[in-house]
Structures are given as C-alpha cells and as structure tokens.
C-alpha cells in the first residue's frame, strides 16, 4: 500500500485548471489503487505564512526562546515535513503565475527547507534527506512555455526537489489555457490522458 500526498497551490479554487487535474488524479488513483491512502492539502485554502525575519529564526537551531509566532511556524514546519516524509508519492499542482510557481507553493517550500532536517551539507556538497519518493507535477499555463526559456517552473522544481532528495520527478503539462476554449479543452484532455498512464504505471 502506498501513501499519496496531493498539494494544491492555485488561488482559483474550483475554477483552477491545475486543481481540476489534481482532482482527476485523485479519482483515477483511488480507482487504480483502492487500498492506498490519499491526503490532500490545499495551500491556498490553508495558507502557509510567509517566511520573514522573525520566522526564519524558528527554523534554525538555537537556544534562544521562541516567540509565540515562531513556535507556531516551527510546529507547522515539523508537521509539513513529517507529512512529506510519511508519503510515498507527492503530487504537486503547480500552475504557472508570471513565469513561476504560486506564492502559496513557495511559502510551503520555505517552511520545509531546513538544514539538518530535509537536507544537510557535507564535504561533497548538499545532500537531500527526503528520499525514496516519487513526485508528479501538474502544471497548467495560459501560454505555451514547455522546453522554452520562459519556463522557469520546471527547472526550479527539479532543482528544489532534487536538493531535498526527491529526484524521481514526472511533469504533466496543460498549456495554452488562455488561447481559447478549444485549446484549453484539448490541453486538459491530453493532460488527463497522460495522467491516466502515470497512475497505472
């Protein structure tokens, strides 16, 4: 039995193309893997606090007393990391906003990137500590960006996930959403077809 974590990050709720793909994934996975456990976390509905000068102090080893706000951030960070570690398959709905990922997903990354916890520095360089995971990225875009210099989402996510130890990463694209209903419908259909294959693999 596998455990699956689905992370949504779109601010558009049910109107979101990436959220629709995430919901489709959940349906398909439940059908194909009936005994598996799926956890869905919506980072827009349950926003992660922005990392600032106060909160960053909570994520670094120190003997200093923590403020109530720092205590909350550290507890949330511990919760998110434990959740990430507990799951085998990590699904991220990551729409492109102004050429990059949503703030909601970046805030999540900022709280799980902790030296000595999710990665460590060694004589040979950084080493990720979140290992043995499979990641599936569902990324929707208004334009066509795949394999072009304007796609900052793919290299960034590969870099970050690899940095914390997740190197098995599959991308599913839904592009050209803003080009009109016909293109958007085809993009969703193509993405769902690929997702069906990914789920059954």
UniProtKB/Swiss-Prot annotation:
Cofactor requirement: FMN
Catalytic function, reaction form: 2 a quinone + NADH + H(+) = 2 a 1,4-benzosemiquinone + NAD(+); N,N-dimethyl-1,4-phenylenediamine + anthranilate + 2 NAD(+) = 2-(4-dimethylaminophenyl)diazenylbenzoate + 2 NADH + 2 H(+)
Enzyme class: oxidoreductase
Domain of life: Bacteria
Binding site for FMN: 10, 16-18, 96-99, 140-143
Keyword Transcription regulation: no
UniProt keyword list: Flavoprotein, FMN, NAD, Oxidoreductase
Cofactor comment text: Binds 1 FMN per subunit.
Keyword match Cytoplasm: no
Enzyme Commission identifier(s): 1.6.5.-, 1.7.1.17
A single GO molecular function term of this UniProt record: FMN binding
Function: Quinone reductase that provides resistance to thiol-specific stress caused by electrophilic quinones.
UniProt family annotation: Belongs to the azoreductase type 1 family.
Binding partners and assembly: Homodimer.
PANTHER family for this protein: FMN-DEPENDENT NADH-AZOREDUCTASE 1, FMN-DEPENDENT NADH:QUINONE OXIDOREDUCTASE
Protein name: FMN-dependent NADH:quinone oxidoreductase
Native species: Yersinia enterocolitica serotype O:8 / biotype 1B (strain NCTC 13174 / 8081)
Lineage: Bacteria, Pseudomonadati, Pseudomonadota, Gammaproteobacteria, Enterobacterales
Gene field: azoR
């Amino acid at each position: 039995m596998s455990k699956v974590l689905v992370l949504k990050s779109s601010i558009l709720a049910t109107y979101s193309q990436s959220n629709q793909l995430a919901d489709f994934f959940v349906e398909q996975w439940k059908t194909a893997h009936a005994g598996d456990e799926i956890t869905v976390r919506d980072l827009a509905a349950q926003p992660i606090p922005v990392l600032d000068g106060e909160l960053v102090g909570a994520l670094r080893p120190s003997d200093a007393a923590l403020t109530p706000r720092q205590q909350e951030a550290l507890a949330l960070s511990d919760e998110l990391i434990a959740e990430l570690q507990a799951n085998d398959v990590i699904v991220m709905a990551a729409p492109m906003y102004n050429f990059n990922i949503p703030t909601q997903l970046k805030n999540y990354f900022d709280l799980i990137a902790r030296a000595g916890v999710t990665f460590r520095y060694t004589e040979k360089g950084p080493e990720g500590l979140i290992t043995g995971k499979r990641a599936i990225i569902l990324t929707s875009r208004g334009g066509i960006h795949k394999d072009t210099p304007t796609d900052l989402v793919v290299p960034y996510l590969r870099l970050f996930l690899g940095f914390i130890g997740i190197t098995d990463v599959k991308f599913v694209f839904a592009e050209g959403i803003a080009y009109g209903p016909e293109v958007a419908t085809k993009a969703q259909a193509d993405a769902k077809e690929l997702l069906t294959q990914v789920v059954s693999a």
